[in-house]
Amino acid sequence: MPATRLDGKKIAAEIRSEVAADVETFVSGGNPPPQLAAVLVGEDPASQVYVRNKERACAKAGIASRLDRMPAATTQAELLAKVAELNADPAVSGILVQLPLPSKANGGTGIDERAVLDAIDPIKDVDAFSPVNVGLLMQGRPRFLPCTPHGIVQLLHRTGIETSGKHVVVVGRSDIVGKPMAMMLAQKDSTCGPAVANATVTIAHSRTSNLAEICRQADILIAAVGRPEMITAEMIQPGAVVIDVGINRVGDKLVGDVAFDEAEAVASAITPVPGGVGPLTIAMLLHNTLMAAKMQAASN
């Protein structure tokens, strides 16, 4: 029996609808609409698509959006000055700098991404990348949760999949997905309650020598490594839940980090690519932007 396909599009639509209703209530209370400011450096086609998708999602949720375009030749000092400008603008609720920044090979100036992300005011850091917000997450008292891991927690919760007492294997150790995902699931509680926390978590990565063996131990396998169809059926325990975070272009189609067709025959539930985790990332970005606006309104 093939696995249940976990419909990220449907759940993301539910979350966006909830955010839109909350925005309406927030604005009707005399507050200005939340505003998300995106900074796009260079002309990377994929980044431009992502930014357009975010703008459209903001508009549907009643969130104002602002896009600051900067040339690929922008210097680090110029980009830091732009971030400082947005930090100081009271109309801006949330700030995101679209990654990746242009490499020198693509006309960039070698900007230190970490320095730029560190410069964003933590109360406007809706991607939750700043050291302050990462530290709060580590302590179990997060201000904002990283969008993709939080979207996965919402997906698990809203489809009735519990992680408490389960062995979760996260393949990938990025600061954006792998590390925060592991930390969130290992906590005693979550935004969705303790049933979507309290996991025993293993982080695997490209240097893990016995990767297939470790993956086969997972009750829930989360693939976030950025390698097309790296996770094959023989790496999946029969009946496991498989969450595929990867988005990779192979020829004229998008594929995940999981070999979907063969994995679907082994797993009990699986996210497709596209239409799985991706839509949830933007939905949680809207959620974080509204949260930021509420916190800033309360502090004024």
Swiss-Prot record:
SUPFAM superfamilies: Aminoacid dehydrogenase-like, N-terminal domain (SSF53223), NAD(P)-binding Rossmann-fold domains (SSF51735). The keyword Protease does not apply. Pathway: One-carbon metabolism; tetrahydrofolate interconversion. GO terms for molecular function: methenyltetrahydrofolate cyclohydrolase activity; methylenetetrahydrofolate dehydrogenase (NADP+) activity. Its EC number is 1.5.1.5, 3.5.4.9. GO terms for biological process: L-histidine biosynthetic process; methionine biosynthetic process; purine nucleotide biosynthetic process; tetrahydrofolate interconversion. One of its GO terms (cellular component) is cytosol. NADP(+) binds at residues 172-174, 206, 247. Keywords: Amino-acid biosynthesis, Histidine biosynthesis, Hydrolase, Methionine biosynthesis, Multifunctional enzyme, NADP, One-carbon metabolism, Oxidoreductase, Purine biosynthesis. InterPro entries: Aminoacid_DH-like_N_sf, NAD(P)-bd_dom_sf, THF_DH/CycHdrlase, THF_DH/CycHdrlase_cat_dom, THF_DH/CycHdrlase_CS, THF_DH/CycHdrlase_NAD-bd_dom. It catalyses: (6R)-5,10-methylene-5,6,7,8-tetrahydrofolate + NADP(+) = (6R)-5,10-methenyltetrahydrofolate + NADPH; (6R)-5,10-methenyltetrahydrofolate + H2O = (6R)-10-formyltetrahydrofolate + H(+). Homodimer. Catalyzes the oxidation of 5,10-methylenetetrahydrofolate to 5,10-methenyltetrahydrofolate and then the hydrolysis of 5,10-methenyltetrahydrofolate to 10-formyltetrahydrofolate. Belongs to the tetrahydrofolate dehydrogenase/cyclohydrolase family. This is Bifunctional protein FolD.
